[in-house]
Amino acid sequence: MRKTLLATTCLAALLSTTAHAETTITTATTAPVRTSTIKSGAPDDIKITSTGSVKPTSGTAVTIDSNHKAINEGTIEISNVNGARGIVAEAGTVGSITNAATGKIIIDEPYAPTDIDNDGDIDGAFALGSNRVGIATLGAFTGNIVNSGAITIEGNDSAGIRLGGPLTGNFTTDGTVSVLGDRALGVGLQDVAGNVRLAGTITATGLDATAARVARSSSRAT
């Protein structure tokens, strides 16, 4: 049974550092980036502007592994790779994660289900790949997490946003989150010590799919 749930080149040449201690990515790169080394080997905040993109061939596109923030106003994309991640914050870090209104995080695959027997109903698996996540934390994280843009994920056992530990800060998603695949999860939260806002559109499509799951919260929902 199908189940659909709806709730409303050289990297150095591509980077610049602004006066307020923020390293910006303004053009396309295929190299993954980390807050701990983004500023010529030194730590800094990362901002992908609307003209910038990070599109590695595998792994995690943006990693927060120091006490800094990551802002995406452009495009983060990985295609057809199991285990791929868009933005990941390592356990114990302090900062913030923002997928802005113009930001896109796409972790997808070329496969698309079709109507094999021409009965007007899509046949076959929803997705072939697995374990893909748009935004993730690997443990406790301190700082706000905001999605006002678009997160598109294709893969079984995959998630749009999945927190792997408690969040000390506010959580907001008022953009779009779309996940396709069996056991898909749109948004998954652990304990949140802050405000939680689930708005915009959250879509999880597949067998045993879940649009939103909040394991526990000491926050105020809005």
Residue ranges: model-predicted function:
Residues 92:
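Short, basic/aromatic recognition patches
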Residues 1-22:
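Gram-negative bacterial Sec-dependent N-terminal signal peptides
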Residues 4, 165, 200:
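Flexible, active-site-adjacent loop/turn segments at secondary-structure boundaries
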Residues 133-136, 159-163, 185-189, 210-213:
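Structural detector for internal amphipathic alpha-helices that build alpha-solenoid repeat scaffolds
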Residues 22-31, 44-58, 71-83, 96-131, ...:
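Beta-strand-rich solenoid/repeat architectures in extracellular/passenger domains
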Residues 65-71:
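Short, surface-exposed polybasic-and-hydrophobic patches located at secondary-structure transitions
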Residues 61-63:
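Charged, amphipathic alpha-helical stretches
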